[in-house]
Amino acid sequence: MTTKRLAKELGLLRQRSASSSAQRSSVCKQRFSFLIIIDFESTCWREKSSSGQEIIEFPAVLLSVCSGAVESEFHSYVQPQERPVLSAFCTELTGITQDQVDSAPPLHVVLSRFSRWLRSLQEERGVVFLTDSSGAAPSAQLCAFVTWSDWDLGVCLLYECKRKQLSVPEALKNWIDLRATYKLFYNRKPKGLRGALLDLGIEFTGREHSGLVDARNTALLAQRMMTDGCQLSITSPERRAQVKPRPHTRPSGLRERHTHLTNVKNSRDTHTNTNTHLTNVKNSRDTHTNTHTHLTSVKNTRDTHTHTNTHLTNVKSSRDAHTRLPALMNGSIRARHTHTQQTCANSSDTHIASASVCEVLVSPYTLLSVAHTHTHLQARSAALAGLSDTTYDPESPAPCWQDGELLVEEEEPSSYDDVILGAEPEEATPSEPRRCVSSSVFKTPPPLLRSGPLSPLTHSLGRIAAPLSVHAHTHALKQKVKVTSPLCVCGRRARRLTVGNGGPNHGRVFYCCPRRRSNTHTHTCDFFQWESGVLQNTLSMLTTHTPAAAHTHLR
């Protein structure tokens, strides 16, 4: 029995013939009659660079789907404009020399030539692209663009045209991502273009990372995939790279200079979702930290340096002197941008570890006596005065972030032929250390000056006879005596609040009825009294009564 007869009996010859015809029919059933394969080569560096990449080689290959032959090609080198000198790494990788790009036209000229080449294909072969396929004749040959990944048309060309204010041709806004199609069809992730060809038994021909050679090999891969039964379709119609502009405004938590912090409640569930670093200082009787708090949550603190100028309304707290973080704005926590910013000044006299964005609040019900040295109070007052005059500047040259997360919008990762690109290392030039300015959200308003001196305060507390503000009286009185909230008409202890509406009384402290106005079952007694009035009564009692009687009354 001859070999030919045995093959006929086994049906090998018929099977081959049927398989070949089936493959041709499956290829011809594709939606597109022509495919244009594009594979750009761009400027690249060994290390990462902040500058964008520019196209230096613009190849295109026209593939006939039915015949599987390459019928036309377009190729041109492109002269880079932003960084015209190629790196040694780029020349070694792509094989493109400096002389080739110097004598090449810029990108806008190459795009014009490429558009003329596309028009010639439309006239000669009746090629129709997706942009004008709606009004095309029934006999028109539909054509699509194919790239190995979304990087060529979705990242490289798009970003460069935006930087140079060039318009992308409408036909190049729709393409087929062959790598994504390969992964879905064969259910495996390819290891680059060469690896995808080797997995299918096709040898990569030519020099790798040469634009025209890569386009030809990509055409071979597309033809093989269609032969295996893969139906090519547009993977990213009118897809744009999601370019998110860097916010040039203040973060949401730092937009208003005088922020109204409302409904600050003393509950344990308030700060469970905050991203800020909270330091719990428990059972400490005297806290004298020079770090000015990393947004500190102080529990059971008997003595803490606290400003009374914080913008608060409806502060709800218990008598345990628990400190809560004033980071609730309209009932929601804005902890994303409450980063602690450190003062980077090269000063040997002032040692400030960090400056808090929000000041720590201590329960205002009880003001305990404090025995501090005059030097410590002056140092702390100078530090807080420096913090209150600064504002947040997102364009500052060298911000110093500490104990916070700097959220940066990152571009969706894409590949440039599976090669890590970057910038060449540059020589480090010595420069003077930058001086960072710390920022603060809240600015302490100027103190309200009284019309005349308070001589009783001068004699009793040892102060100089000069016009003093209400805050100065409060601070002086807090160092000597305990001040108890007055009783309202309801018979309850009045609540101590601070005006935060930015008006003429901004920063002043007052007392009101502790009952909520929103409660319909109970009615408030409309009790209201400025703290300055309470202090005046207390000071007058200090001068008219004996020290023992005044001390008994204040308690």
UniProtKB/Swiss-Prot annotation:
Catalytic residues identified in the record: 41, 209
Similarity comment text for this entry: Belongs to the ERI2 family.
Cofactor requirements of the protein: Mg(2+)
Compositional bias annotation for Polar residues: 290-299
Enzyme class: hydrolase
GO molecular function, one term: zinc ion binding
Protein name: ERI1 exoribonuclease 2
InterPro entries referenced in this protein's UniProt entry, alphabetically: 3-5_Exoribonuclease, ERI-1_3'hExo-like, Exonuclease_RNaseT/DNA_pol3, RNaseH-like_sf, RNaseH_sf, Znf_GRF
One Pfam family matching this protein: Zn_ribbon_GRF
Amino-acid positions noted as binding Mg(2+) 1 in the UniProt annotation, renumbered to this chain: 39, 41, 214
Chain sites annotated for binding Mg(2+) 2: 39, 152
Annotated zinc fingers (GRF-type), start-end: 488-534
Chain positions recorded as AMP binding sites: 41, 209
SUPFAM superfamilies reported for this sequence: Ribonuclease H-like
Keywords: Exonuclease, Hydrolase, Magnesium, Metal-binding, Nuclease, Zinc, Zinc-finger
Cofactor info, note text: Binds 2 magnesium ions per subunit.
